[in-house]
């Protein structure tokens, strides 16, 4: 896996909405984005790793669905999240 517990805790603390928040869309999208970044670096060295490529596609789709949900329900939180993560507004 790409993230250890300390890195996950750091990301969760940055994007959490409450004290024990680990499931808000912001936290989920930020964790998925860090895994996507790790996998894209992984594919630069391992071009034939097609099994992980399928996992990457699943992560991208999951992030897309979460961002679409967040945009539909709270536009302000969506805008701040994509600005913080450096994503395009294409959802």
From Swiss-Prot:
Keyword Disulfide bond carried by entry: no
Pfam families from the UniProt entry: Ribosomal_S15 (PF00312)
Annotated PROSITE patterns: RIBOSOMAL_S15
UniProt keyword rRNA-binding present: yes
Entries under Gene3D superfamilies matching the protein: 6.10.250.3130, S15/NS1, RNA-binding
Subunit text: Part of the 30S ribosomal subunit. Forms a bridge to the 50S subunit in the 70S ribosome, contacting the 23S rRNA.
Protein purpose: One of the primary rRNA binding proteins, it binds directly to 16S rRNA where it helps nucleate assembly of the platform of the 30S subunit by binding and bridging several RNA helices of the 16S rRNA. Forms an intersubunit bridge (bridge B4) with the 23S rRNA of the 50S subunit in the ribosome.
Descriptive protein name: Small ribosomal subunit protein uS15
């Amino acid at each position: 896996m790409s993230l250890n517990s300390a890195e996950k805790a750091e990301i969760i603390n940055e994007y959490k909405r409450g004290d024990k928040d680990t499931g808000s869309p912001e936290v989920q999208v930020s964790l998925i984005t860090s895994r996507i970044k790790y996998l894209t670096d992984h594919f630069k060295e391992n071009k034939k790793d097609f099994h992980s490529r399928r996992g990457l596609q699943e992560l991208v789709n999951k992030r897309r669905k979460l961002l679409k949900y967040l945009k539909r329900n709270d536009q302000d939180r969506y805008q701040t999240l994509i600005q913080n993560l450096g994503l395009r507004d294409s959802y």
